[in-house]
Amino acid sequence: MSNKKDAASLLKRYLIARIPFIVLKTIETARALDMIRDVSLELVQEGWLDEKSFYAHTMSKGVYNLFTNQAVGNTGSSVLSAMDFTVKLLRQDQKLNQTMVLTEVPDISGENGDSQRILDLISLASEMYGTVIVFYNNS
């Protein structure tokens, strides 16, 4: 990640533009989640987005609301469960502007079932003006 201020500014512009797929290359999951939470809070305060539209997934917490840290339902801890939750969330009542942060994603560098599922999720996010943010670390 570049310096935090530049990264936060770029992330804010991407979220305002509703870019459907954002990749953050980082090994610092906690710092990146804090930055996303800070940027998201700014966007909520400025009226761009709703605080009920930001979710994150970690292996230890499962899916949770990024602002309240409250677990969301019985989603399980796997990234595939988080992806299924996101699909349901985007389809539910045609909710727009939902954001899901996936901190652990399977290898999507090749053509396989996992990469196809992520592609389908991103396509749906694009249709519903949602955003999927994934953390990537190739080391």
Q: Model-flagged regions — what are they?
A:
Residues 1-139:
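ATP/nucleotide-binding catalytic cores
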